[in-house]
């Protein structure tokens, strides 16, 4: 569903309003005062979040974010505040960054927070967008789209609810019994709610959802408001780990370094184990890689997850850069050329159907594509203005530098064996010496996961990839990434990368002349006439072995403890190795998957709101493959 931005409008007295819904965004007596009286105080805050590890708020109707800014402001002012504040909010018609700035200027006391929000305001694409603010301690998860479709897909465990859509008379869908029933499913134990609405239908629907509601004095001349508390223990995600926040991460490539960084951001101590002498020396060691999504006409799972992964990855890269860490990357843009006229027509239809924001994706005809590439091209294609090239080794290193007091690296130590005990997991080296122990272990060791007996159920295959390097003259094109059944990237330190080959179950570590020729042929297909000027005597390159999955999606989650399961078995009922997780199967899209996969896994382990819709989380579950073979269940020996 395309996202149509809200249109900025005001009533005669200057109150922000929606012409589409015929209602105002806040009480005429003051939006900030209403947020503090109805929603913050109405949910017993700040007292209820004090002393907590994390606290989650779910809001229906983000509007222009005034409730969020007021809550963030109250959290900052509270010396007893929780360690991490999660604020999850759904909005069908979000404002543009420019209109947000116009609206937020009315409250100068919130200016620093509003500016930080504006700096990180996401591209207006459908689905979930996770933003880390206030040095990562305030996490805003925005759901852009229809709440009736999105809330049933959310996994949250909310401690408080802000019900702040337009009035039931103007926007009845947001107050329907079916939608309010989802709040009961999403409620954590002891969850509260507050809303300015005292509609009888709303209160009856909330009661049916498990909330005991009461009327209370209202705000701005409104006689009453509604407060409630959930009667039963909620079914949101619970912490999956032991009280000791300590994890082993096996592997220091994109998967492992990203996971270590996301756990450390939550205050976890992490031991990273890798046989190499430093981070990013295996499949994550290429000179440059590409960060961009893969749209589809039907917006399938791959399209949705690559969109979420690319946008979250960009957010993560910007935060590392803002922190002064030496990650090398450039959002120069990615040009994805059509393979042929049929594919070109399909690319046009994708853009016409989904109407994405122009700062995310647009179709460019041949002449504009040629201008962007700096080279005459035979076809047009997709242009991703925010697409980027990234140096994977620098990203791995930057991830591990974020929390030097919490991340300890054991380089040059190959894990030979992983053993479970009553206290968790211990990794041993080839001499039988313990490297480190922790209650939680994460397998992020690429194709090495195939040698771990506990992960025998995971169908990870090795895909050999060869990238070609050649000297690039200063100022030579292209200065953007160009893809067409291969890719060529801007030069880094005078060297340009082109590739890559993809050969499954091929263990040859040396460069092959035939693969160099294949990559030059791909380069010629991308930029006709370009390869002729490449000095073949100066060719170099690199070989890596990428962990691939059968369905081109990564594996993120707890490792199954059985080799097969009945197809009717729900994923949640498949036996797992307690405290053992995998981040695997990245294939050729490691940069797209890594940051989001790590955030998903860390959120699951910590019992926090998840950053992806439930069906997409299930699509990444390592146990999904067990439901595809023959019937029956066999436990590992």
UniProtKB/Swiss-Prot annotation:
Residues 1-231 are annotated as: tRNA (mnm(5)s(2)U34)-methyltransferase. Transmembrane segments: none annotated. The keyword Flavoprotein applies. Pfam families: DAO (PF01266), Methyltransf_30 (PF05430). The keyword tRNA processing applies. Its cofactor is FAD. GO terms for biological process: methylation; tRNA wobble uridine modification. Keywords: Cytoplasm, FAD, Flavoprotein, Methyltransferase, Multifunctional enzyme, Oxidoreductase, S-adenosyl-L-methionine, Transferase, tRNA processing. Catalyzes the last two steps in the biosynthesis of 5-methylaminomethyl-2-thiouridine (mnm(5)s(2)U) at the wobble position (U34) in tRNA. Catalyzes the FAD-dependent demodification of cmnm(5)s(2)U34 to nm(5)s(2)U34, followed by the transfer of a methyl group from S-adenosyl-L-methionine to nm(5)s(2)U34, to form mnm(5)s(2)U34. The lineage of its organism: Bacteria, Pseudomonadati, Pseudomonadota, Betaproteobacteria, Rhodocyclales. One of its GO terms (molecular function) is tRNA (5-methylaminomethyl-2-thiouridylate)(34)-methyltransferase activity. HAMAP family: MnmC. PANTHER family: SARCOSINE DEHYDROGENASE-RELATED (PTHR13847), TRNA 5-METHYLAMINOMETHYL-2-THIOURIDINE BIOSYNTHESIS BIFUNCTIONAL PROTEIN MNMC (PTHR13847:SF283). In the N-terminal section; belongs to the methyltransferase superfamily. tRNA (mnm(5)s(2)U34)-methyltransferase family. Residues 250-637 are annotated as: FAD-dependent cmnm(5)s(2)U34 oxidoreductase. It catalyses: 5-aminomethyl-2-thiouridine(34) in tRNA + S-adenosyl-L-methionine = 5-methylaminomethyl-2-thiouridine(34) in tRNA + S-adenosyl-L-homocysteine + H(+). Its EC number is 2.1.1.61, 1.5.-.-. The gene is mnmC. It is found in: Cytoplasm. InterPro entries: FAD-dep_OxRdtase, FAD/NAD-bd_sf, MnmC-like_methylTransf, SAM-dependent_MTases_sf, tRNA_MAMT_biosynth_bifunc_MnmC, tRNA_MNMC2, tRNA_S-uridine_synth_MnmC_C. One of its GO terms (cellular component) is cytoplasm. This is tRNA 5-methylaminomethyl-2-thiouridine biosynthesis bifunctional protein MnmC.
